[in-house]
């Protein structure tokens, strides 16, 4: 028979594929806030894009927000920041448990800039 076992075909495909098997296309892009930015308001918007089926978690020292992206993968949430530097961790968690993390530092100031 000239038929091949499907698992053998898959093994051959994996061996010759230029794309690593672990690359699921899962990503996280944060549009706002920019890293090391200054804010003159206590409330800032965290927004970006990821895969539509991910769960996005926005963490600061005082809060955590869980956000579901739109069908296009867009997400946005408002968080309250404290005086001085604020360390913000944005994580996208895929259904398979894969995690992408982006960190931002945003400083709150009442001074004109």
Predicted features and spans:
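Ser/Thr-rich low-complexity repeats and stalk/linker segments
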Residues: 1-113
